[in-house]
A protein has these predicted regions:
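Hydrophobic alpha-helical transmembrane segments of integral membrane proteins
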Residues: 69, 133, 253, 270-271
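Hydrophobic transmembrane alpha-helices of multi-pass small-molecule transporters
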Residues: 204-205, 265, 272, 281
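Interfacial loop-to-transmembrane junctions
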Residues: 246-268
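C-terminal transmembrane helix pair
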Residues: 243-244, 269-275
Length: 286
């Protein structure tokens, strides 16, 4: 019951903050109180700081070290740079060298986690990883939707990204449950199978086709977004599983009843957002 309640609560908050329903509900009670883009910003900001807090706790920073005092000011500074662009509608998806470098840093952080994990036992490594793993993906998440303050419109790119992530997880789970035989990463995530992965890819692309069919004005092609989500979503899960394994932690936190922490729920989102953002850049270039 607790898990069901936590899932419904989490899903409802995400839906209300990533569609126009949130501001409609609030403004029906108190007219003109909030605009949808502000709700979305609040959601992403909450996710960022809760996720960063969980990451700091999970990685066990030295209480006497200076790094634990620097991590949050650095995250605030990085996120502030993205926030300025968000409120000025400054995400153009042009080939921007600073954005490409930021995306490359995420790749380096993931490779470090799997191939050079000993670097993360030092507090300076923990500091750099935490900033990259939290501030950059959630910063890029601000750039995905389009909005207008004049008529309070807000597009559904992030809502459908969540839909694809949730659906991909479900498709992979049920396909793996009935047909799974070959383990994908038995030491990191023993329940994942290649058959489940293939089922997740196939059905998520089909779902992306229907999203593209009925919502053609969204950024990008959602069949391609579905493919990216189904491929990189499991990687996000493996990244967080490896992080928890490295530091001997079962759950990242307990903020969502029955579901663990923010990082447990958003592991796929954290990796999928930069990938989709890069796709939007490439699509505009091509």
């Amino acid at each position: 019951v607790l898990r069901l309640f936590g899932g419904v609560l989490y899903g409802s908050v995400v839906i209300l903050c990533t569609t126009s329903w949130g501001s409609q509900v609030i403004n029906s009670i108190s007219p003109g109180l909030v605009q949808q883009h502000t709700l979305y910003y609040g959601l992403i900001t909450f996710f960022l700081f809760m996720g960063a807090w969980e990451c700091v706790k999970m990685m066990k920073f030295d209480p006497k070290g200076w790094e634990k005092w620097v991590v949050f000011p650095l995250i605030v500074f990085v996120f502030y740079r993205f926030s300025k662009r968000y409120f000025s509608n400054g995400f153009y998806f042009d080939f921007n060298i600073s954005e490409i470098l930021a995306l490359l840093l995420i790749v380096i952080a993931v490779v470090t986690l799997f191939r050079f994990s000993k670097e993360l036992y030092y507090d300076n490594g923990k500091l750099i990883f935490t900033v990259i793993y939290t501030a950059l993906p959630f910063g890029f998440a601000l750039g995905l939707p389009k909005f207008s303050t004049a008529d309070n419109t807000f597009t559904l790119e992030v809502f459908f990204l969540f839909v694809l992530i949730w659906s991909s997880d479900s498709f992979a789970y049920f396909t793996g449950k009935f047909f799974g035989k070959h383990k994908m990463a038995p030491k990191i995530s023993p329940k994942k199978t290649w058959e489940g992965f293939a089922g997740g890819v196939f059905f998520t692309i089909i779902l992306g086709y229907f999203i593209e069919l009925y919502y053609p004005d969204l950024r990008g092609n959602y069949m391609i977004v579905g493919l990216l989500v189904s491929v990189f979503g499991p990687l996000g899960d493996l990244v967080e599983s490896q992080l928890k394994r490295n530091f001997g932690v079962k759950d990242s936190g307990n903020v969502i009843p029955g579901h663990g922490g923010i990082l447990d729920r958003l592991d796929s989102f954290i990796i999928c957002v930069p990938v989709v953002y890069l796709y939007f850049i490439l699509e505009k270039l091509i």
